[in-house]
Amino acid sequence: KKSYFNLPKKFKYIDAITDIDTDLQSNFTLNLDKTYKMKNYNFSTQGKVKKVKIKLKNLSSNIVNMTNIDLVLVKDSELKLDLANKKRSINLTGKYTLDNKKYLEYNIKNNYNTKSSQLDLNLQFDKRVDLQLINYFKKDGIIANLSLNLELQKERLKINHVKFIEGDTQINAENVLFDKNKIINLKNLSIKTYNNSKLNNDFSLSLGKKIKIKGSQFDATNLPKILNKRDRKNSFSKMSKNIDIEFGSI
């Protein structure tokens, strides 16, 4: 049976959830005081998600150019959901596809309340990825592994860590802070990438009052063009233009 949900505005990246087929067991508890006023509540459910269709929106980035993604199909997944009056959590593990052909593995954990949200994500990803800043390109069909831990509070986003692995390519970042979609700080970024099987990036980077870049190889083909962009969506506009570089090859 087809189901449809209109989601709250805070789910700005999800437009609709449809075609839901699940086998779940749920439990609800409610505590009242002497005047029968609700003190707290808890709703929990767990079981199998046989299939679900998730329609996405507003997925765009000035940093990463990817294949357009507007629909996710999920199947053969395990769901555990806890909703309390002060905090909530979701744990979902199984398989997903973006093209209704190849299904890949994923795991999502989300803890959230009215003020903040923390997300742990681990998944396989086989769509195109174009990181213009470092001149790295991954073709459609090549599977990469992505792990991510982030915190969201109002208009501030903090990525505690992110790891992207595709073959010999590895990209790791720690403590990346965004304010209104602009990067304002990055503790450490280590990058090792290949272009046409040739090493084109092998360096570490930190962002603060200065941009510090150190390593043996850095593909700066697109860097001047990106840093000088003036459009409102430029994610790098709040970054320092003071760059300290120590390299063997640029």
Spell out what each predicted region is.
Residues 1-250:
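Membrane-proximal interfacial segments on either side of biological membranes
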